[in-house]
């Protein structure tokens, strides 16, 4: 399975940093500056893992996650936040997130969460056979 990731963040710096770190780690990365751009990309391609910022201008990450779940329940969705104290994993799971990452972004923090996401996808596919 090709390890494709979609990164959604309205901050250019964060998006570029994630793209560089994940590409360097061997993943195939696409990115979008808004949920609307992300939905356009998702119509053309399947992304097993989606990493999205929680606070964005046009649509927040929670609404974005809920809309993804309405369309596609198999992707692993990882929240990205600089405000870890405002969110807890259980609340995020209730709205459809699989996991979360906190800023500042570092590869040694991201890679285990992303790999767990790909493992979860593999298990979901096995259970649907």
Specify the residue positions occupied by each region the protein language model found.
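Helix N-cap/capping motif at the beta->alpha junctions
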Residues: 31-40, 61
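Active-site beta3 strand of CheY-like receiver
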Residues: 45-51
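Receiver (REC) domain active-site loop signature in two-component systems and cognate sites
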Residues: 56
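Short amphipathic alpha-helix used as the core "switch/output" element in two-component signaling
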Residues: 40, 62-73
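Charged docking surfaces used in two-component/phosphorelay signaling
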Residues: 16-24
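C-terminal output helix
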Residues: 105-114
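Alpha4 helix (beta4-alpha4-beta5 surface) of REC/receiver domains from two-component response regulators
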Residues: 63, 84-99, 112
């Amino acid at each position: 399975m090709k390890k494709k990731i979609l990164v959604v963040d309205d901050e250019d710096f964060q998006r570029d940093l994630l793209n560089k770190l994940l590409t360097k780690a061997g993943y195939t990365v696409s990115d979008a500056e808004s949920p609307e751009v992300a939905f356009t990309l998702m119509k053309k391609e399947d992304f097993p893992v989606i990493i999205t910022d929680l606070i964005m201008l046009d649509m927040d990450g929670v609404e974005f996650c809920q809309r993804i779940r309405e369309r596609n329940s198999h992707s692993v969705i990882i929240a990205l936040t600089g405000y870890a104290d405002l969110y807890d994993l259980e609340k995020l799971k209730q709205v459809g997130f699989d996991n979360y990452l906190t800023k500042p972004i570092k590869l040694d923090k991201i890679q285990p969460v992303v790999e767990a996401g790909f493992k979860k996808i593999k298990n979901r596919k096995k259970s649907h056979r």
